[in-house]
């Protein structure tokens, strides 16, 4: 849906580096009122440059009600590429409330020479792809995706997350590291070598902030079990923060020209 009214109030569905960068670039604009929403899954989120709303909306209907009540003029979905439910709710809510929606979707990674990827569609497939023989696996996944690996307790698992895994992974050998990225390729290469990792399990998150482990696996000639992205709603989308800014500026200029 293209913007048809004067855009002043913007809601950003966040939780990604791109959402934070977008908020930073909009924070100083006196012509806009920007709110950033976070799901609330991180105990101590980073400070944000604009007002923040933490927590869910209660599905698509709840989000639509919020858009109407707060008189939101534009909705930017800058959530993680694997936040399929949130993106689907955003699409339905925007349509119901008559609010223009733009999705900011970073491009997926693609294989380059030297990569050894085993591509899977589900976490359960990733567990099976590890095989029966004991391995040392780096699980570069969200905390919610870890529990299926209890079905394969013979492996040693290395887990790195901002907050502790709760409940802990119920396997004999799980190593948890609390750390907040981004991490460089050199840092991830050192991590993989230090823990003698022989396979990486990752989401195809795209972007540069978490690519270090992919480059490190390539350098160390380690296989990567890559979880494919989920299907996302077909809505207007761009790949960069700069394109979002251009979309907003065009919408604002168009509304001014129409005298809205």
Residue map of PLM features:
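Glycine-rich, highly charged phosphate/nucleotide-binding loops
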Residues: 50-70, 178-187
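Internal active-site segments that recognize and position negatively charged phosphoryl groups
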Residues: 124-158
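Short, polar loop motifs at secondary-structure junctions
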Residues: 36-44, 104-110, 123, 143-146, ...
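C-terminal functional extensions of proteins
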Residues: 195, 204-216, 224-260
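Histidine/lysine/aspartate-rich catalytic loop segments that bind and position anionic ligands
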Residues: 150-182
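N-terminal beta-loop-helix "entrance" segment that forms/cooperates
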Residues: 35-58, 113-116, 168-174
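Glycine/small-residue-rich loop that forms an oxyanion/phosphate-binding "nest" at active or ligand-binding sites
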Residues: 64-124
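N-terminal basic/disordered segments at the start of proteins
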Residues: 10-39
């Amino acid at each position: 849906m293209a913007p048809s009214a004067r855009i002043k109030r913007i809601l950003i569905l966040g939780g990604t580096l791109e959402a934070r960068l977008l908020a930073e670039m909009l924070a100083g604009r006196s012509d806009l009122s920007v709110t950033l929403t976070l799901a609330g899954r991180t105990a101590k989120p980073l400070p944000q440059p604009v007002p923040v709303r933490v927590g869910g909306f209660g599905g698509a209907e709840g989000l639509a009600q919020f858009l109407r009540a707060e008189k939101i003029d534009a909705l930017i979905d800058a959530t993680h590429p694997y936040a399929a439910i949130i993106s689907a709710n955003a699409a339905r809510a925007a349509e119901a409330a008559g609010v223009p929606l733009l999705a900011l979707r970073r491009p997926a990674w693609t294989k380059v020479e030297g990569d050894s990827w085993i591509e899977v569609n589900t976490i359960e497939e990733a567990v099976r792809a590890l095989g029966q023989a004991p391995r040392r696996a780096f699980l570069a996944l969200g905390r919610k995706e870890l529990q299926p690996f209890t079905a394969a307790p013979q492996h040693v698992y290395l887990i790195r997350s901002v907050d502790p895994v709760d409940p802990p992974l119920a396997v004999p050998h799980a190593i948890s590291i609390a750390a907040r990225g981004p991490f460089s390729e050199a840092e991830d290469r050192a991590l993989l070598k230090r823990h003698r990792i022989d396979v990486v399990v990752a989401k195809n998150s795209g972007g540069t902030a978490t690519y270090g482990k992919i480059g490190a696996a390539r350098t160390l000639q380690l296989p990567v079990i890559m979880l494919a992205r989920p299907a996302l709603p077909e809505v207007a989308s761009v790949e960069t923060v700069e394109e979002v800014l251009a979309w907003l500026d065009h919408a604002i200029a168009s509304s001014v020209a129409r005298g809205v």
